[in-house]
Amino acid sequence: FNLYGKFFKMQNYLVLLLAIFALNSYAEIIGKANVTDGDTIVINDIRIRFTGSDAPESYFFGKTQTCLDENGKEWECGKAATKKLKQLISNQTVRCSDEGQDRYGRTLGICYVGDMDLQAEMVKSGMAVAYLRYSDRYEQQQNYAKKVKAGMWSGTFLEPEVWRKENRN
């Protein structure tokens, strides 16, 4: 009867269990994505809201967010943002980190196609704004979009968060 041997085996099991928990704590969601709007996708029935960016709404209580271009002409920036994200994904496999959940129960994530950060591309193209209240992760991309007057920055628009508050039923 060897107590030291039993203790050593138990210690190995504990190390193995800790390793498994550590791997599960950094979960990734990988698969084909269905685009809901410019900052939300669904992979394997998991609704993922991009963290760090906010896109105009394509459908919010029956309404689509509009913006004004450089000539003051109204355009459906919400639908344009959804279209842009669909183009970026282009039926490729998407990989998202699981960053927890928002207050609506959606999984928050940073999502990639290959090495391309989808949120960074959406902000850089002016089809989303950096969610600076939560993170400065995409501030450089937003500054670039403003400088070149990309997407929404070509004219005037309400920040998506403000637009949602004004258009809630």
Q: Residue locations for each model-derived region?
A:
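Small beta-barrel nucleic-acid-binding modules, primarily SNase/OB-fold domains
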Residues: Q11-L14, F21-N169
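Short non-domain terminal segments
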Residues: G5-K6, A19-F21
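Short, Lys/Arg-enriched N-terminal segments with co-localized hydrophobic residues
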Residues: F1-K9
